[in-house]
Amino acid sequence: DRTYAEKALDLFKRILRNLATPGLLEPKYLPTLQARGHSITMILINTASRIRAAIADPALDKQIDDSIALLQKDFMHPEFNALLETVGSNGEFIDTINGRIINPGHCIETSWFILEEAKYRNWDKDLLQLALQILDWSWEWGWDKEFGGIINFRDCRNLPVQDYSQDMKFWWPQTEAIIATLYAYQATGDEKYLQMHQQVSDWAYAHFPDKEYGEWYGYLHRDGTVAQPAKGNLFKGPFHIPRMMIRGYMLCKELL
């Protein structure tokens, strides 16, 4: 039913208007801090691409281009080999406890959004190079060489991180890494990415599933032991795990 696609497109355009019109939305940051966030920039890539699969519109392609350009220009900071979560309004580095934050799982998720777009464009070389750079940087920051798994937060100067869960292992960074490494292997044929995929997949499936009752726990200590047994809450719903399984199945089917 095309009417649902049209409704989704209309809502997407309204969201863009709200984001672009000062005063319509409550400011995310205090007026004293002019900043922009990684979250909305990256999620608009995926949202636009999902709507585009149902209905074509130039606004969708434009938003994908704009978001990718912003990520490359403002959020990627080669001096730290990192994609930062919060930057100044023109991409300036904010040398505070919030401005130094790296969220490896979030960045890895961004990398596969861009890999997916590169694939859509017949493996566009520039997008592929950008996505792999983000993935490589973020894996280096995120993979816990001592205990395994993707860690929650890092500081780009290796200073203390504010969030108390900074060294925990949440479920969703692992699922995003499983997808991203498989996409990267499909794009390049580089065995490095297949090994990374097996690494994170093996670790996730060894630690997150409840072997007695099924489903995944959401929150592990750094060493992989369960921090709390709830399998669903305000943040953990039926999204990241099914998406990982569906995407993984589709990619493996293409590869095999």
Regions found by a protein language model. Give the residues of each.
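Glycan-recognition and catalytic cores of secretory/periplasmic carbohydrate-active enzymes
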Residues: 1-256
